[in-house]
């Protein structure tokens, strides 16, 4: 193997895991040489109401992009995640809930989950929700979020979850785009000792133009905090559930019926509604969960992601429950009230598989041994990382400290658009290299291409693409198939472009090098630079703005904003604070710029295009390697920006 630090699979791990290296290689080869035969067999991981006869039907051709899997089969997601486990696992815990503070927790068995999901599905029906209708969720990390998701799938409604940290404007935009019929929320959320005004944000969102598609708001009383109540529109979760039966027949859904919409940031500013469908998504969620985490009966699994992100959808709810696992849902943050909180939760619930983000790992690493103080973490056997590439130093710390030098780390690479993990080690099959996502999952055909789209062989670096479809792939952008083709299939013809750069080493391992488009990855969450820029320029004192990503030791990427003020306006500490607060209000705390650089002008080409490449170099202090600047309309602007950057840093 090449020179990086290697962690080989131990004999014991290989012996006790679901797959060895030889089995992986054999199955992987089968999955790409005959995808229909491979997935035709693997699709049986689910229960089908009407078995499929067709497996794969996909095309990445320009103007004809179409993705279908198991298209003549019928199934129900909630039945696969709950009902089929009732006979053998009715009394097993399905959802373990841990509150923001250690004095709040709850255990929900599969039997209890079935009852709650059926009741809430009947509530949705009584509110006029039908198959294909969109339901918007803006929820805290409580079991009710999973109940609401599963209730939607039971009756064939399409859920659209908005992350609980997003602003009223962001909620409204997603409601309008999806024509949501109902909003499900809570009075307030709790996170890291703070209270999040969920209901108040929904109330404000529903004052915006175009949100009159919403007929009712169902409110779960989470904190008991006082909220505004709109008579005739707002309904109390507990009261409406009490009137409903705890039986609800699951709707038979076609494999290609929509399952959920999840909005993700694009480089053009308007969020994109990624659409996943029922059959292929759930097959892929179930398969990847089982093999990537080497899931075995009795495991207690904890994915720390919020359900507002794709990781929470696939690996907190659908993947684990489809496998009949026990999934821990956590309301808090890994370092509150003390840096040892994550390790304490592991010990309290005997967590055996832990899936978290490099941001959390780096934040804990900064606290050193405080992160593990008073804990033993002896229940852990598998660690996972998700959201962004993990730097080798953080990987080693995670392995040595949290995992006690005995738990393999699955460093998973995937996206909202991919539905599930595409590149990852498999615990008993893959020798590990800190910082590498290693090898593709079954059926996944990655390639590295140069800027012309030429496929590079062997050791190479360039743009990461996928050459063929896999069952969990998104099908389209909601109500915008043209934008879907334009965004993902126009850069490199006949290939799915991930937007990420990667290199492949001499062992065929993939190393993700980060975004190659105008999308930031802040704390593992994607945000379009254009989205933040449009929030900035909507401030009455700002004329122009350009946003770039800069390295950040905790968040991975920080947000560096160049801001040009209107004539007659001048920088001040007060305005600095006001502008940061403005962005928080417009988008959410996660989009708050780390640095504002007051700029008299921005570097532009003669055609008026802002040269972000140059702004990135200046922001990261690489002003001695700006590259070709011959197309600049006014080179003196660059000199001024470099001078200002040096003065402030």
Curated annotation (Swiss-Prot):
Keyword tags: Acetylation, ATP-binding, Ligase, Magnesium, Metal-binding, Nucleotide-binding
HAMAP family: Ac_CoA_synth
GO molecular function, one term: AMP binding
Binding-site residues, ATP: 387-389, 411-416, 500, 515, 526
Modified how: Acetylated. Deacetylation by the SIR2-homolog deacetylase activates the enzyme.
Enzymatic reactions: acetate + ATP + CoA = acetyl-CoA + AMP + diphosphate
Family matches, as InterPro entries: Ac_CoA_lig (IPR011904), ACAS_N (IPR032387), AMP-bd_C (IPR025110), AMP-bd_C_sf (IPR045851), AMP-binding_CS (IPR020845), AMP-dep_synth/lig_dom (IPR000873), ANL_N_sf (IPR042099)
Organism: Psychromonas ingrahamii (strain DSM 17664 / CCUG 51855 / 37)
Gene Ontology annotations for the cellular component aspect, listed alphabetically: cytosol
Domain of life: Bacteria
Binding residues for CoA: 191-194, 311, 335, 523, 584
Protein name, UniProt field: Acetyl-coenzyme A synthetase
Modified-residue entries (N6-acetyllysine), positions: 609
Name of the coding gene: acsA
Enzyme class name: ligase
Residues reported in the UniProt entry to bind Mg(2+): 537, 539, 542
Described function: Catalyzes the conversion of acetate into acetyl-CoA (AcCoA), an essential intermediate at the junction of anabolic and catabolic pathways. AcsA undergoes a two-step reaction. In the first half reaction, AcsA combines acetate with ATP to form acetyl-adenylate (AcAMP) intermediate. In the second half reaction, it can then transfer the acetyl group from AcAMP to the sulfhydryl group of CoA, forming the product AcCoA.
Biological process according to GO: acetyl-CoA biosynthetic process from acetate
UniProt similarity note: Belongs to the ATP-dependent AMP-binding enzyme family.
Short name of any one Pfam family annotated for the protein: AMP-binding_C
EC assignment: 6.2.1.1
Swiss-Prot/TrEMBL cofactor(s): Mg(2+)
